[in-house]
Amino acid sequence: QLLRALHKGIVITGSENTRAYECDGLSVYRQKPLAVVLPENIEQVKQVLQICKTNNAPVVTRGAGTGLSGGAMPLEKSIVLGLSKLNRVKSIDVKNRLAVLEPGVRNIAISEAVKEHGLYYAPDPSSQIACSIGGNVAENSGGVHCLKYGLTVHNVEALKVLTVDGEELVLSRKDDGLGLLALMNGSEGLLGIIIEITVKLIPMPQLAKVVMAAFDSVRDCANAVADIIKAGIIPAGLEMMDKFAIEAAEGFAQVGYPLDAEALLLCELDGTEAQVQAELDTVLKVLSGASTLKVSESEAERLDLWKGRKSAFPAVGRLSPDYYCMDGTIPRRHLADMLEKINELSKK
């Protein structure tokens, strides 16, 4: 029915042809779908939903397939609905700092589209060059800047969603009643198909600097995270890496990470020049016990320091093509103990 209703180029069938869609970034679990459909417009999405409903076929929505939770993994005999071709930036409202997007727009493409207006989109997952905004909403993605600027849920103003019946719903932050907009964020495609996203944009900061601090122990590095927050600083980005991650990222990206460090902390500060300098003075005092301290001296150097961290996932993939990666949530007060325990288990 799908082949009859839609032109051949957007329906993929056959075991070998659908292999690329049998998993997302969580590659330890795999399941081939019955077929994959790559619609080119919303009407085709509605057609697919109608046909699948009539035939009682499960539908699994897919963005770019970079997620790490298995959210885009097909069910047995399911139809994968890939939305990568719906990739238009529909409108940009500079005055109100909003952008209306189709779900297949890549995360990094949002900031590229509004850069000329001095704006950008804050959430920046490590897969931002490939991941889609629809997938970001489905996974409630974060990124290195989520500490200060929030997750996807904090940066989405409205959604247009299709139910399995093909009904179109508009969910907005301005709606009264139940928080359905927030509910859709992180729902992994289970509650509806996201066909349009309105995101908020923020002004590019006057200045941004990254402090790179190397430590002789994971515990000292983890304690530094808590100390920075305790000092009243909310960094634009705050990320730590252990020795294995440092070696993997440096081998892949070659950005100048110190390979003799047991742990590395990247702390980004942004704002006006005066704000950044004041916060930088405080952070450097907090990090005075680090074995190495370096502050980015240019925008290119700042981006390079983050490039290494954002390369960690593909870097480890180069060492082991099949590995298990999940996000964990650890209270800051337990971070040092948890990381030391993980290192102990790794040695075993």
What is each residue range found by the language model?
Residues Q1, L38, I42-V45, P103, ...:
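Generic structural signal for well-ordered, non-membrane alpha-helical segments
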Residues Q1-Q50, G67-R97, S126, K243-Q254, ...:
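N-terminal flexible segment immediately upstream of the FAD-binding catalytic core
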Residues T13-R19, P203, K209-K348:
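C-terminal substrate-recognition/cap domain of FAD-linked oxidoreductases
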Residues G14, R62, G82-S84, D124, ...:
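Generic beta-strand/beta-sheet core signal
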Residues Q31-V59, L98, G192, T198, ...:
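Soluble FAD-dependent oxygen oxidases
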Residues I51, V153, Y257-A261:
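Acidic/histidine-enriched ion/cofactor-binding microenvironments in catalytic or ligand-binding pockets
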Residues R88-M241:
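FAD-binding subdomain of flavoenzyme oxidoreductases
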